[in-house]
From Swiss-Prot:
Protein's recorded name: Dihydroorotase
Catalytic machinery residues: D301
Family according to the record: Belongs to the metallo-dependent hydrolases superfamily. DHOase family. Class I DHOase subfamily.
Enzyme class: hydrolase
Source organism of the structure: Lactobacillus delbrueckii subsp. bulgaricus (strain ATCC 11842 / DSM 20081 / BCRC 10696 / JCM 1002 / NBRC 13953 / NCIMB 11778 / NCTC 12712 / WDCM 00102 / Lb 14)
Keyword Repressor recorded: no
């Protein structure tokens, strides 16, 4: 059967064009005008995008499925227009052996409704200095390496990890955090931490480890990717490293682009995340970094928690914010429609073809004949409200609930099959 998406504004090759998209046998067959098919999806007035790509999600499965599981996490991704995700390995048990990795990959495929690529850990159990067998993990299905949630504390361990990752052509995606400097902090170091009387987090906890790792990456030649950069100095370090030819890429998270420490209204656990919300100066530097290419892509760091884990004050709340279901619409509304900081084409690139390119996810994040029919359709014309009852994730831990947005997802297709349709829970 042939399905045609008619009369939409299609994002293709960095441009927006008025076109139809023809789908057959799970693939894009053609993009053009006056196309016909057995089934017609009317996209008049809608944006037709490649399925978005999020290289940073936490699905808590196995081990903490009361927070999220593969099924609900992938449904949340589809609700946000994402058709390809990278799942972090901070689950229980950590998939640090070939058998555990194979099992994770199989579970992702069986339970997920989007394409799920699985990270392997940089170190065994994510908290030791012992390296797993990277070659075996890659053979079992790992697409990259990360200890996300934990910084690699020992320089020698990271140096050895980068050497082995380079040998096996694996990206090292780092959560840059020196625990001795983080020192059980809660809120960015500054006036807000003083106002709330909460332990501060110095930016040095992030920047010193980035500086260390960039030198190690230069020495080893590994592809070093930095998760959720959040400070002005981090951006400056990456900018200098790229100018020196170091093989480094990095991502920014929607919440660090949209919010600052000044937006924390009170001691509210929904605003507790790691890295923490930073200063307005840091936020401005992230936006400049995106626009000048220092920051390569946007990734959500979707980190769901049970409601009770975010109640009360920030001191005892869990770190983390959901992002899969709110990323595109909140970013589009603020930075494209309202403030005109960047274009729709730029936003779509940072959320689709750029992450796919950086991580070598071939045929993801693009609409081209012969590629998988992974498609997202968004409504840019009508205002809607973000409501808890509409979330597909088990986690409702986001301060964006109640916000009026444009860019709600109308439909998401994976391999030509509808996996999300507005109005269906």
């Amino acid at each position: 059967m042939q399905t045609v998406i008619k009369n939409g504004t299609v994002y293709q090759n960095g441009r927006l064009i008025h076109a139809d998209v023809l789908i057959e046998d799970q693939k894009i067959k053609a993009i053009g005008t006056d196309l016909t098919g057995d089934k017609v999806i009317d996209a008049t007035g809608k944006l037709v995008s490649p399925g978005l790509v999020d290289v940073h999600v936490h699905y808590r499965d196995p081990g903490q499925t009361y927070k999220e599981d593969i099924e609900t996490g992938s449904k949340a991704a589809a609700h946000g227009g994402f058709t390809t995700v990278g799942a972090m390995p901070n689950v229980t048990p950590v998939p640090d052996t070939p058998d555990l990795m194979k099992k994770m990959v199989q579970e992702n495929k069986q339970k997920g409704i989007v394409h799920i690529f699985q990270y392997g850990p940089i170190t065994k159990n994510e908290t030791t200095d012992e390296l797993p067998d990277y070659a075996a993990l890659k053979k079992a299905g790992a697409f990259a390496l990360s200890n996300d949630g934990h910084g690699v504390q020992t320089a020698q361990t990271m140096y050895l990890a980068m050497q082995e990752a380079k040998k096996n052509d694996l990206i090292v995606a780092a959560h840059a955090q020196d625990d001795s400097l983080f020192n059980h902090g809660i809120v960015n170091e500054g006036e807000k931490a003083k106002e709330l009387n909460l332990p501060p987090v110095t930016e040095l906890a992030e920047t010193t480890q980035i500086a260390r790792d960039l030198l190690l990456a230069e020495k080893t030649g590994v592809h070093y990717h930095i998760c959720h950069v959040s400070t002005k100095t981090s951006v400056e370090l990456v900018r200098m490293a790229k100018a020196c030819g170091i093989n480094v890429t990095c991502e920014a998270a929607p919440h660090h682009l949209l919010l600052t420490e000044d937006d924390i209204p009170k001691d509210n656990g929904y605003y507790k995340m790691n890295p923490p919300l930073r200063s307005k100066e840091d936020q401005a530097a992230l936006l400049v970094g995106l626009l000048d290419g220092t920051i390569d892509l946007i990734a959500t760091d979707h980190a769901p928690h049970a409601k009770q884990e975010k109640q009360g004050g920030m001191q005892n709340a869990a770190f983390g914010i959901t992002g899969s279901e709110t990323a595109f619409s909140t970013l589009y509304t603020k930075f494209v429609k309202e403030d005109k900081v960047f274009t729709l084409e730029q936003l779509l690139s940072w959320l689709s073809d750029q992450p796919a390119k950086v991580f070598g996810l071939k045929k993801a994040g693009v609409l081209e004949p012969g590629c998988p029919a992974d498609v997202a359709i968004f409504d840019l014309e009508h205002e809607t409200e973000l409501k808890e009852k509409n979330y597909q994730s088990k986690g409702i831990n986001t301060p964006f609930t109640g916000q009026k947005i444009y860019g709600a997802t109308v439909m998401t297709m994976v391999d030509g099959e509808v996996v999300y349709q507005r109005g269906e829970k």
